[in-house]
């Protein structure tokens, strides 16, 4: 089954019913139901939802916002390739959750791939995507997709955008990524 074809991913609006969403993480569920729309309105973050195309129910979500990563927090091999600014621009994947009814089917990877493509296509300089894994299982999930731990940071991982795109789509130019290639990011 092609998981990506079963869902449309779109920005969160007031039309999305969040009341029944249950991921198994009380803090993520509470955030999604009570805070996500306020953060989006305040432009603190942008929230995207995966909506089941048959039932129109929300099956997952993620948030993106801007952040900076101190240059000396990056692995030395990465840091030496960058300008010697105090920090490099990054996108923070703040939250990612999948409803229990859809867990284990690959939707988390599809959401991650969508976040990477949206970040790469943004018309601003972003070197990497950064995530703060909430636990060891989340850390392993991100590591499967190429994220690496930042030295000295507990569960903060990063993935250079160009690396993600090159590995999944065969190009580091997001404008050249086809919809089919975009679905492969996160697989």
Language-model region placement:
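Conserved beta-hairpin
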Residues: 43-66, 76
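Conserved active-site alpha-helix within GNAT-family acetyltransferase domains
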Residues: 109, 117, 125-126, 133-152
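Conserved acetyl-CoA pyrophosphate-binding loop and the N-cap/start of the following alpha-helix
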Residues: 102-114
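Active-site/acyl-donor-binding loops of N-acyltransferases
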Residues: 148, 153-164
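Conserved acyl-donor/pantetheine-binding loop and adjacent beta-alpha core of acyl/acetyltransferases
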Residues: 61-95
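Intrinsically disordered, low-complexity and often Lys/Arg-enriched segments
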Residues: 1-6, 168-187
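Short amphipathic alpha-helix that is part of the acyltransferase structural core
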Residues: 1-38, 42
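Conserved beta-strand-loop-alpha-helix junction that forms the acyl-donor binding cleft
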Residues: 99, 120, 126-139, 158-162
């Amino acid at each position: 089954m092609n998981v990506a074809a079963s869902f449309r991913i779109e920005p969160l609006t007031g039309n999305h019913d969040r009341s029944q969403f249950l991921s198994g993480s009380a803090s993520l569920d509470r955030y999604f139901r009570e805070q996500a729309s306020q953060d989006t309105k305040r432009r603190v973050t942008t929230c995207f939802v995966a909506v089941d195309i048959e039932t129109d129910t929300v099956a997952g979500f993620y948030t993106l916002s801007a952040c900076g990563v101190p240059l000396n927090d990056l692995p030395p091999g990465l840091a030496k390739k960058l300008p010697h600014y105090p920090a490099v621009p990054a996108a923070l994947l703040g939250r990612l959750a999948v409803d229990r009814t859809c867990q284990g089917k690959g939707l988390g990877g599809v959401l991650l791939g969508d976040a990477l493509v949206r970040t790469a296509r943004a018309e601003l300089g972003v070197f990497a995507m950064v995530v703060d894994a909430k636990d060891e299982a989340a850390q392993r999930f991100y590591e499967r997709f190429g994220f690496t731990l930042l030295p000295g940071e507990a569960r903060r991982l990063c993935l250079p955008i160009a690396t993600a795109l090159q590995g999944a789509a065969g190009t580091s130019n997001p404008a050249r990524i086809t919809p089919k290639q975009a679905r492969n990011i996160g697989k």
